[in-house]
């Protein structure tokens, strides 16, 4: 399944420490939830800067920056080479493949890859349904969402770093419109085993492949949920009820709490989810 990109510029500016803090808080919940913070390579970083940061993009948090993530998608999903992924596939003998996205524009002096990333950083997070969000049922459902433990992984709120902060190994200066912003992505950006694993580890570069994460997935951000019908990584859950039913593994105890809600309480929680 394709991933939502709207608002990812804000996700990029979440402090690494805030994501790592989620690991500690989950351990304190004593529900068998044990998220993993992935160390992902910063492909655009220089040799003099730290080479890894906390991953947050991709189904397995295999990327830590939008530049790295977009470069990977161009190369491995569209077959378009670029400066971060300059090579052809070893199995292909082509020497005249697609031109890398690295030719600066005469006016902006930005490459196509840089313009693509800049465009994604400009996007706003999906807005909630304003009317449904203030309804009594949705507000009650939001409280239930937290009470039964859904919010342990689907963390609602972060504040982005200050404007002017240099992130991504110093390669990116956070602009004013992204800095000091309170956002509500509803994700911890950690990897979890909820029983739906595909057995495929993913990493930005082969040396970072970790077989222990093969059956784990990043907690899917829930903002914009109301615009999607086919859920989970494989799209095999037609709606939120079906997606909740597939939450096993680390999420088993929380799912059981949902199962024990009354029909009225389940309706309230579903109304909250429909407002996102």
Predicted regions and their residues:
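Periplasmic c-type cytochrome electron-transfer domains
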Residues: 1-276
């Amino acid at each position: 399944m394709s991933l939502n990109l709207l608002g990812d510029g804000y996700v990029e500016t979440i402090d690494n420490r805030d994501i790592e803090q989620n690991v500690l808080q989950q351990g304190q919940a004593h529900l068998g939830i044990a998220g993993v913070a992935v160390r992902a390579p910063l492909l655009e970083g220089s040799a003099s800067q730290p080479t890894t940061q906390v991953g947050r993009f991709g189904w397995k948090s295999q990327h830590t920056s939008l530049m790295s993530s977009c470069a990977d998608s161009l190369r491995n999903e569209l077959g378009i080479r670029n400066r971060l992924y300059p090579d052809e596939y070893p199995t292909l003998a082509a020497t005249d493949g697609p031109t890398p996205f690295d030719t600066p524009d005469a006016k902006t002096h930005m490459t196509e890859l840089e313009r693509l990333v800049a465009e994604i950083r400009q996007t706003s997070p999906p807005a909630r349904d304003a009317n449904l969000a203030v309804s009594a049922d949705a507000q009650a459902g939001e409280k239930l969402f937290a009470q039964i433990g859904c919010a342990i992984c689907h963390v609602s709120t972060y504040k982005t770093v200050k404007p002017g902060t240099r992130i991504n190994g110093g390669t990116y200066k956070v602009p004013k419109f992204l800095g000091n912003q309170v956002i509500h992505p509803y994700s911890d950006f950690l990897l979890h085993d909820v029983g739906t694993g595909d057995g495929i580890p993913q990493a930005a570069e082969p040396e970072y492949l970790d077989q222990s994460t093969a059956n784990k997935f990043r907690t899917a951000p829930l903002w914009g949920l109301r615009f999607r019908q086919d859920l989970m990584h494989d799209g095999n859950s037609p709606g939120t009820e079906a997606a909740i039913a597939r939450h096993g593994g680390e999420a088993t105890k929380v799912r059981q709490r949902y199962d024990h809600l009354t029909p009225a309480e389940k309706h309230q929680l579903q109304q909250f989810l429909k407002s996102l």
